[in-house]
């Protein structure tokens, strides 16, 4: 008998974590093991959203330490929009002129913790969307308790060139359809399992 050996090439799926803040102090002691576990599970690339100037050095240092795996975003998180938000935005703009980033983020609106700076958050969101269009970068949107307003603002800027993801989406089907109509993706996380999730 002649045996024919068949070689089946199995390609391992490459996974990308589109949103992880691995540069925060909580990971400082075991970042190497975190990266090894991610690789063991097929997660080869990790996208790092910016928060504000207080974490910027840690963000960029992690990217420098793991240049084949970690890719930095640049932006001002809506929960960091406070009294000094204009200086923070100036820093974001300055960094965008210095080097390329994978995306503009984490930007958007956050009404869950504090509603003191809603108008300033909206101003910062609009401005950073303009920069995303200028630099032809996707945006990563924080929309906790603010999905309708985020959709409205994105819609005003959407002329076919704006794209990105609504991070940690937990709203209802109607909002999901509007987001898809805008050509955007949704990040689905554990929040979707909460009782008050709209899906």
Q: What is each of the regions a protein language model found here?
A:
Residues 3-199:
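Mid-domain alpha/beta scaffold segments of enzyme catalytic cores
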């Amino acid at each position: 008998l002649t045996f024919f050996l068949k070689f089946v090439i199995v390609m391992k799926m490459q996974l990308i974590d589109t949103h992880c803040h691995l540069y925060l102090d909580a990971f400082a002691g075991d970042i190497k093991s975190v990266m090894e576990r991610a690789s063991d599970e097929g997660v080869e690339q990790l996208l790092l959203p910016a928060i504000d100037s207080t974490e910027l050095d840690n963000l960029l240092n992690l990217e420098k330490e793991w240049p084949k795996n970690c890719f930095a975003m640049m932006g001002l998180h809506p929960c960091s929009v406070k009294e000094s938000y204009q200086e923070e935005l100036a820093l974001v703009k300055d960094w965008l002129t210095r080097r390329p980033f994978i995306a503009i983020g984490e930007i958007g609106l956050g009404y869950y913790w504090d509603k003191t700076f809603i108008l300033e958050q909206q101003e910062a969101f609009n401005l950073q969307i303009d920069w995303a269009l200028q630099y032809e970068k996707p945006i990563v949107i924080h929309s906790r308790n603010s999905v309708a307003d985020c959709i409205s603002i994105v819609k005003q800027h959407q002329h076919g060139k704006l794209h990105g993801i609504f991070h940690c989406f937990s709203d209802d089907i109607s909002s999901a359809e509007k987001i898809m109509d805008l050509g955007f993706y949704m990040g689905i996380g554990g929040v979707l399992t909460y009782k008050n999730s709209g899906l």
